[in-house]
């Protein structure tokens, strides 16, 4: 029987990643099928899977680097969060990355008693309670305009349930899972588009998978898969919201190297260009996600803030027609002069004029 320590140590984090990746891999099509918010592009399950895959790969790289020795827990937890950050896909994946980053900020910090700590707050279960609370609060802060009935609501319910539970880490994780699952069933009544479609929130559904995996890593008993999907109905094509009516045409995602001040200005700029704005990260590295009509303007805003790279642009209309098939790609050219920009534009590329790097 595998070891099931009542502590989120390095081995448990590795197991958590593995179990979560397996669960999302099994459920990704089901989650894709109920994806109707914020855009019905049928990719939430896939985006969550790819985000967790990047996190898992980062964790495995740490274990490889340590060779036959067991890695430091802090190194593994930070790697998980960093891997999710650089590999985050879509709105849901970006929020998941911030949830993991919030947890890592607590779980990877030195465990020292501080003035004002409540009894047990620095033990393993207490740290997990604080980590789940930090995860939820940091995710809300990352979203420009938080909406209830989404994975944010589910994350908060998980943190609330964990905070109200005594016992070890496994018991706290189980309470968080139960709280998240209960909150998930309430999402159709909180968000009208979910109620009309008769589904729960897709991002929240994926988060329940991730929390179920956490339970499995700490207790050795992962909650039954059939219980996680209770109340979900597949959206028929003739009932799905029209992707092309209302809302921006493009999803733009990129990694950005920039300082805190520049990112604060970028948030304001992007908030005026579109919606579904989520900016996650810190310490000079960020993942930027936004839905806009002018993809070039969103990228140019990133160039003004710092150094954007790994730029991805998805046209929602194309995603609707080719759901769960190969995503169409766009070409973005960063060019030094207007003449070259004109040539690239005529060839069908989105062009951005290069600017000197910011010094503040």
Name each model-derived stretch:
Residues 1-360:
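N-terminal loops that bind phosphate or other acidic moieties
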């Amino acid at each position: 029987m595998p070891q099931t320590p009542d502590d989120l140590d390095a081995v448990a984090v590795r197991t958590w990643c593995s179990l979560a990746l397996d669960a999302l891999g099994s459920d990704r099509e089901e989650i894709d099928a109920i994806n109707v918010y914020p855009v019905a592009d049928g990719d939430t399950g896939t985006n969550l899977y790819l985000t967790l895959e990047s996190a898992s790969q980062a964790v495995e790289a740490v274990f490889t680097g340590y060779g036959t020795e067991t890695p430091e827990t802090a190194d593994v937890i930070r790697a998980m969060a960093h891997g999710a950050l650089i590999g985050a896909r879509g709105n849901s994946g970006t929020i998941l990355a911030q949830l993991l980053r919030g947890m890592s900020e607590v779980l990877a910090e030195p465990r020292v008693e501080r003035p004002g700590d409540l009894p047990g707050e620095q033990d393993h279960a207490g740290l997990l309670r604080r980590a789940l609370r930090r995860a939820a609060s940091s995710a809300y802060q990352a979203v420009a305009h938080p909406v209830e009935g989404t994975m944010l609501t589910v994350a908060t319910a998980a943190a609330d349930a964990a905070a109200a539970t005594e016992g070890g880490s496994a018991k706290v994780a189980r309470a968080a899972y139960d709280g998240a699952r209960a909150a998930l069933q309430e999402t159709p009544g909180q968000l009208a588009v979910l109620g009309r479609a008769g589904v729960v929130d897709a991002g929240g559904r994926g988060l329940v998978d991730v929390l179920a995996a956490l339970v499995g890593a700490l207790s050795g008993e992962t909650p039954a898969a059939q219980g996680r999907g209770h109340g979900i109905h597949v959206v028929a094509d003739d009932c799905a919201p029209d992707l092309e009516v209302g809302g921006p045409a493009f999803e733009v995602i990129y990694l950005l190297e920039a300082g805190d001040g520049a990112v604060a200005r970028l948030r304001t700029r992007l908030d005026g260009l579109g919606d579904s704005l989520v900016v996650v990260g810190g310490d000079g590295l960020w993942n930027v996600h936004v839905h806009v009509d002018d993809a070039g303007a969103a990228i140019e805003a990133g160039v003004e803030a710092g150094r954007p790279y790994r730029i991805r642009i998805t046209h929602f209309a194309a995603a609707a027609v080719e759901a769960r098939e190969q995503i169409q790609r766009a070409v973005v050219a960063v060019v030094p002069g207007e003449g070259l920009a004109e040539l690239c534009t005529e060839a069908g590329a989105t062009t951005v004029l290069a600017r000197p790097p910011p010094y503040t």
